[in-house]
Swiss-Prot record:
Residues 111-124, 159-168, 210-230, 370-396 have a biased composition (Polar residues). GO terms for biological process: cellular response to methylmercury. Pfam families: DUF2722. Keywords: Cytoplasm, Nucleus. It is found in: Cytoplasm; Nucleus. Residues 1-22, 98-126, 145-168, 203-239, 254-274, 355-396 are annotated as: Disordered. InterPro entries: DUF2722 (IPR021216). This is Protein BOP3. The keyword Cytoplasm applies. Disulfide bonds: none annotated. GO terms for cellular component: cytoplasm; nucleus. The lineage of its organism: Eukaryota, Fungi, Dikarya, Ascomycota, Saccharomycotina. Residues 355-369 have a biased composition (Basic and acidic residues). Involved in resistance to methylmercury. Overexpression suppresses a PAM1-SLV3 double null mutation.
Length: 396
């Protein structure tokens, strides 16, 4: 009863003081309560109250530090008396957050700032009293790491293969790399060899069995011909359907061209013989184009003038017949001696000689790309009056 009375009296006194505090509104309640807006004291009093609150908090923190230090000393004494190894004692001061508690030797300089550590160590003390005698040395590998202290495991390379042979892992890796450059190149070479072997088999089938040699199939060359030049115009046609009388498109041989002066073309048999002679004089390889170096003569189609042709034409003209002028003179001289009947017989010969002379001149004009007026002499300019330039030159 006495204890009940002792507890009841302070309770009643606390209720009375609480009523008095609500009425008087103490300074601490005004600072840290809900009635801060109703502050009725000076500003200096408010600053003093804040300084007082700060000192109270510092006192509390110092008290918790000392309490934690005392609990740690007691725990250390209990562990040393129970025979715990020295290298395992520091694990008793580890907290749940992975931060170890300060050892007794460094307690003055490094102390935790939480009061929870002291309470946890005090809770562990009663448990250690009964089971400290049965403690055994702990193993470092058996301690499970905390979530904060856990680190990712490093990458481990596979074990090196034995010297006697290749390991199974390397074999599987080689098989998986199907698109490696070496395998791609090997497959391409294999495909190329297959194509070559197919072509060689085709060639071997065409050759008779008695003519086969003992050479290696790699040394044999395919008999396929290069057919790119067949698109060009050639003089000989390999197709039997095309007649041999057809000539090439690019043919500049003047011997094959028919002159204008001939009234009748040669017979078709002679023309065919001429073409076949020109086309088959040089031996030709099948499928290949034979190139003949021909020095192009100056013709009217090219417009090139060759002055040596003029002398040749003059010589031919002299050899064939005399000039029309001499023929006219001879006709004039003999007209007085011979009768009129002989003149009538010689007129066709004179006309023929005139035509031949004109034809020679026309051929000469065609070869030299000139006109008939070029054979006439150039007119001489006659100066009737002296010009001013001539007077100036004569005066000087």
């Amino acid at each position: 009863m006495s204890t009940f009375n002792s507890y009841s009296q302070p309770k009643e006194s606390n209720d009375n003081s609480h009523n008095n505090v609500n009425k008087s509104k103490s300074l601490l309640d005004i600072i840290f309560g809900t009635n801060v807006s109703e502050w009725a004291f000076s500003e200096n009093a408010l600053m003093k109250a804040m300084d007082l609150k700060i000192e109270q908090e510092k006192t509390k923190q110092q008290y918790y530090k000392l309490e934690n230090l005392n609990r740690s000393i007691e725990l250390f004494k209990l562990a040393s008396s129970s025979g715990l190894p020295i290298n395992q004692i520091h694990k008793l001061f580890n907290t749940d957050h992975g931060v170890p508690a300060s050892s007794p030797m460094k307690a003055g300089g490094n102390q935790p700032h939480n009061n929870t550590e002291g309470t946890q160590s005090s809770e562990n003390l009663p448990r250690l009293n009964g089971s400290m005698k049965s403690l055994k040395p702990l193993n470092m590998n058996t301690v499970s790491p905390t979530p904060m202290s856990r680190q990712p495991s490093p990458y481990k390379f596979p074990a090196s293969s034995s010297t006697g042979g290749i390991s199974h892992s390397t074999v599987t890796n080689v098989q998986r790399r199907a698109n490696s450059p070496a395998r791609i190149g090997a497959s391409a070479v294999a495909a190329l060899n297959d194509n070559i072997s197919i072509k060689e088999e085709d060639v071997a089938r065409r050759i008779p069995s008695g003519t086969k040699s003992q050479e290696s199939p790699l040394n044999k060359k395919p008999t396929s011909l290069h057919s790119r030049n067949l698109s060009l115009p050639i003089g000989k046609f390999t197709n039997p359907n095309i007649p041999s009388t057809m000539t090439s498109i690019l043919s500049f041989n003047r011997d094959q061209q028919q002159p204008l002066s001939q009234p009748l073309p040669p017979p078709p048999q002679q023309q065919q013989d001429l073409h076949t002679h020109n086309l088959h004089t040089i031996p030709r390889k099948p499928g290949m184009v034979q190139k003949k170096h021909r020095r192009a003569r100056s013709t009217s189609s090219f417009g090139v003038i060759d002055l040596s042709i003029i002398d040749e034409a003059k010589e031919k003209q002299v050899q064939r017949s005399p000039s029309p002028i001499h023929s006219n003179v001879s006709v004039a001289l003999t007209s007085h001696d011979k009768p009129i009947e002989s003149n009538m017989k010689e007129q066709p010969n004179m006309l023929q000689s005139v035509r031949e002379g004109r034809q020679v001149h026309d051929d000469l004009d065609d070869r030299t790309c000139s006109e008939s007026s070029s054979r006439n002499e150039s007119p001489v300019r006659t100066i009737t009056k002296d010009n001013s330039v001539g007077k100036i030159l004569n005066s000087t």
